[in-house]
Amino acid sequence: MANDPIHQFQVSRWIPIDVGGVDLSFTNVSAFMVATVVVASGFLYLTSSGRGLIPTRLQSVSEMAYEFVATSLRDSAGSKGMKFFPFVFSLFMFVLVANFLGLFPYFYTVTSQIIVTFALAVLVIGTVIVYGFFKHGLGFLKLFVPSGVPGIIVPLVVAIEIISFLSRPISLSVRLFANMLAGHITLKVFAGFVVSLAALGPIGIGGAVLPLIMTVAITALEFLVAFLQAYVFTVLTCMYINDAVHPGH
């Protein structure tokens, strides 16, 4: 079981909770989502509480994250979109910290669960829909009628735009889930090769050198992927928010 690359994604009930036949158990996924929030909040608190004129390295990282989200949101949705900054920044930090924590031994990668990433994606699209109708009313539906489209093909274009819009939660969630899942499976497979070959003795240890090098390389790549997936998730979120702020553009 220890060498099973899928075992690391198993969901375990830590505190069984059943309410009216609905399973609301506190699981390992729940625990590590809480841990992600605590770590992200603690990091931001520690890095933003300093009063020194010269920022520390960690404070610089925190400021870079702030500037990245602020710039992405401003470039995508303009100044009117900045009201969503706390929401987008919270999403970015949650996904980023969750991805990074999952790379450490004995930590669970919560973003490798499709239900978690889908919930985040639905939260984004739900926010877009609610704000769009709240701010623009039926004018939000202009989003599905691009300007300059000949009247004869408007029904076809509207149908395509609606399908494209409704598929956003799926593409947004699957992209994050699939990348984290595939990367961790690959890493586990190569790490398993190292352990299995090393257990064979001197000859096996010699054969474990290449898988060990690959494991180190994949680990480094996974850190890059962890950041890139948080980056992509945030940029797409900013683009979707622009649809709520400026549906006719």
UniProtKB/Swiss-Prot annotation:
> PROSITE patterns in the record, alphabetically?
ATPASE_A
- Entry's transmembrane regions: 26-46, 84-104, 114-134, 143-163, 193-213, 216-236
Q: How does it sit in the membrane?
A: Multi-pass membrane protein
Q: Fetch the CDD domains from UniProt.
A: ATP-synt_Fo_a_6
State the compartments where it is located: Cell inner membrane
Q: Which UniProt keywords apply?
A: ATP synthesis, Cell inner membrane, Cell membrane, CF(0), Hydrogen ion transport, Ion transport, Membrane, Transmembrane, Transmembrane helix, Transport
- List, alphabetically, the GO terms of the cellular component aspect: plasma membrane; proton-transporting ATP synthase complex
Question: Does Secreted appear among the keywords?
Answer: no
Pfam families with a match to the protein in the record: ATP-synt_A (PF00119)
Keyword Ion transport listed: yes
InterPro entries found in the cross-reference section: ATP_synth_F0_asu, ATP_synth_F0_asu_AS, ATP_synth_F0_asu_bact/mt, F0_ATP_A_sf
Superkingdom in the source lineage: Bacteria
Q: Which GO terms describe its molecular function?
A: proton-transporting ATP synthase activity, rotational mechanism
Q: What is this protein's function?
A: Key component of the proton channel; it plays a direct role in the translocation of protons across the membrane.
**What is the annotated quaternary arrangement, including any partners?**
F-type ATPases have 2 components, CF(1) - the catalytic core - and CF(0) - the membrane proton channel. CF(1) has five subunits: alpha(3), beta(3), gamma(1), delta(1), epsilon(1). CF(0) has three main subunits: a(1), b(2) and c(9-12). The alpha and beta chains form an alternating ring which encloses part of the gamma chain. CF(1) is attached to CF(0) by a central stalk formed by the gamma and epsilon chains, while a peripheral stalk is formed by the delta and b chains.
Family, per entry? Belongs to the ATPase A chain family.
Return the protein name. ATP synthase subunit a 1
Which species is this UniProt entry from?
Brucella anthropi (strain ATCC 49188 / DSM 6882 / CCUG 24695 / JCM 21032 / LMG 3331 / NBRC 15819 / NCTC 12168 / Alc 37) (Ochrobactrum anthropi)
Q: Which gene encodes it?
A: atpB1
